[in-house]
Curated annotation (Swiss-Prot):
GO CC terms of this entry: plasma membrane
Record's function text: Converts cobyric acid to cobinamide by the addition of aminopropanol on the F carboxylic group.
Protein name per the record: Cobalamin biosynthesis protein CobD
Lineage: Bacteria, Pseudomonadati, Pseudomonadota, Alphaproteobacteria, Rhodobacterales
Organism (species): Ruegeria sp. (strain TM1040) (Silicibacter sp.)
InterPro entries registered for this protein in UniProt: Cobalamin_biosynth_CobD/CbiB
Chain's gene name: cobD
Superkingdom to which the source organism belongs: Bacteria
Family the entry assigns: Belongs to the CobD/CbiB family.
């Protein structure tokens, strides 16, 4: 079977069941195992001199593990491939986490802050309602690219090996891809490879969002806003979502008690995002997922 034919049931299974707690409370989630592998490489290699070279070695190990494991698992048949893809694509989980912020924010600020703290790394203790909403929307848009479209894309392109390599590198980037004293050198290779692997998926995610919301005509503005972002990729789905909802995203935010300047995305949009804005974001993400599924079905029929 083609990878497109396998991806169709995988996307549907993920959307229907997400990450059932009864299962993953008893078994280690593959993402957790990936994190343990990255942590082991960090503990073993991130010390002494030549840390950038050691970081390249760590990334090479991750690529090799993904390639080998994906090749081995592919021999177990289509059902295994579908199940693994369903587990590693995270649309339902993404929506659940983002929607939880809207629910919390509708109750009170503290509940909203607690919910958004689950999905962002910035300081949340003193966030206002609009800041909570913007953070949730930004996270939803970015993770639609990282957690849904990118894994689906690499599964389409290279099957299980492609999917596993992507998830391993993306996990490494989330753990060691920081410009801090500890990871500036060691995490360089993981961060750069993650950037490369997300170039096409990020722009595809933005296009899907723009198409389902009738904002394709704003592509020039979306592109300009995307380039303001510090990440070469995260700005694309965020800029598209900002236009889709008519809100301004990004802007100054606090990390580790320090307020840092970030350019506004869709600066002319409303800066009063709310729980309702988050709910609309979730609706856009489902519509974008639906269009992605239609495209995968079309590929399955063609190939």
């Amino acid at each position: 079977m083609s990878t497109a034919a396998l991806l169709i049931p995988a996307m549907i299974l993920d959307a229907a069941f997400g990450e059932p707690k009864w299962l993953w409370s008893r078994l280690p989630h593959p993402a957790v195992l990936m994190g343990k592998l990255v942590q082991a490489l960090d503990d073993r290699l991130n010390e002494g001199d030549g840390r950038q070279v050691k970081g390249v070695i760590a990334v090479a190990v991750l690529v090799f593990v993904g390639l080998l494991l994906g090749w081995i698992l592919s021999w177990f048949g289509s059902l295994v491939s579908v199940l693994i893809a369903a587990i590693l694509i995270a649309q339902r989980s993404l929506i659940d986490h983002v929607r939880a912020v809207a629910t919390g924010l509708q109750n009170d600020l503290d509940a909203g802050r607690s919910a958004v703290a689950m999905i962002v790394s910035r300081d949340t203790a003193t966030m206002t309602g609009p800041q909570i909403a913007r953070s949730a929307i930004e996270s939803g848009a970015e993770n639609f690219s990282d957690g849904v479209i990118a894994p689906a894309f690499w599964f389409l392109v290279a099957g299980l090996p492609g999917l596993l390599i992507y998830k391993l590198i993306n996990t490494a980037d989330s753990m060691i891809g920081y410009r801090t004293e500890a990871y500036e050198d060691f995490g360089w290779a993981a961060a750069r490879l993650d950037d490369v692997l997300n170039i096409l998926p990020a722009r595809l995610s933005a296009l899907l969002i723009a198409l389902v919301t009738g904002r394709a005509g704003d592509w020039g503005e979306i592109s300009a806003d995307a380039r303001k972002h510090r990440s070469p990729n995260a700005g694309w789905p965020e800029a598209a979502m900002a236009r889709a909802l008519g809100v301004a995203l990004a802007g100054p935010r606090s990390y580790d008690g320090e307020m840092r300047p970030f350019a506004w995305v869709n600066a002319s949009g409303s800066k009063s995002a709310s729980a309702h804005s988050i709910t609309r974001c979730c609706e856009v993400l489902w519509k974008s997922w639906g269009l992605a599924l239609v495209l995968v079905v079309a590929l399955g029929l063609l190939f």
